[in-house]
């Protein structure tokens, strides 16, 4: 221990950058992988953000990988300064997960949504509606870490995975859902309410599970 302390002191005296640079990198890594606790809102039909970041787009698209319907997609950009842990948008069961190998465009580019390496999740809510969530890599973020398993039951706001460094997360909602955020809003995964589903019996059937998922 004394030898290590002496070596550290000598390094600080002779070449401070030898210690400062690794220490700064270590501090950034620890800060980047932070996972702060979140207060998860309660209430029927509430959908919380699956990621920290900024809402970059809200649009109607054709979701062809899982539900084959027109959906309302909310895109969230995660900078390197955001928490990168992903959280479930609602109480749900994992009914689908698959990874697509692609390119590594900047996560803010429109091409990132369809061309970048990504992992798609299908989360079935208690009323049978499926929420589609995509973890999308970026120019820097090149690794998706899935934590949840197929058929696993998850509570709203529970951690299901992580994307390392700047990236994008998307959530696809039924057209009948009431979106409560706007482009430019900052959101927090697991705590910011981004939408409300219609009451049971009134929700449109555009995101009901396909027969092979039932």
Describe these PLM feature segments.
Residues 1-214:
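Contiguous, well-folded functional domains in the mature portion of proteins
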């Amino acid at each position: 221990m004394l030898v290590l302390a002496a070596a550290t002191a000598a390094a600080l005296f002779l070449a401070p950058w030898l210690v400062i640079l690794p220490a700064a990198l270590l501090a950034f890594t620890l800060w980047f992988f932070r996972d702060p606790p979140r207060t998860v809102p309660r209430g029927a039909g509430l959908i919380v953000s699956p990621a920290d970041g900024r809402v970059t787009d809200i649009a109607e698209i054709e979701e062809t990988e899982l539900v084959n319907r027109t959906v309302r997609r909310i895109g969230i950009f995660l900078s390197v300064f955001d928490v990168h842990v992903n959280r479930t948008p609602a109480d749900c069961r994992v009914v689908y997960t698959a990874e697509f190998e692609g390119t590594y465009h900047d996560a803010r580019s429109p091409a990132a949504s369809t061309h970048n390496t990504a992992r798609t999740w299908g989360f079935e809510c208690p009323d049978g509606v499926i929420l589609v969530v995509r973890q999308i890599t970026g120019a820097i973020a090149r690794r998706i870490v899935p934590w949840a398993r197929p058929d696993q039951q998850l509570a709203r706001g529970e951690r299901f995975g992580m994307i390392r460094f700047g990236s994008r997360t998307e959530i696809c909602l039924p057209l009948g859902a009431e979106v409560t955020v706007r482009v430019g809003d900052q959101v927090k995964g697991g705590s910011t309410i981004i939408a409300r589903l219609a009451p049971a019996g009134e929700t449109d059937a555009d995101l009901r599970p396909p027969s092979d998922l039932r």
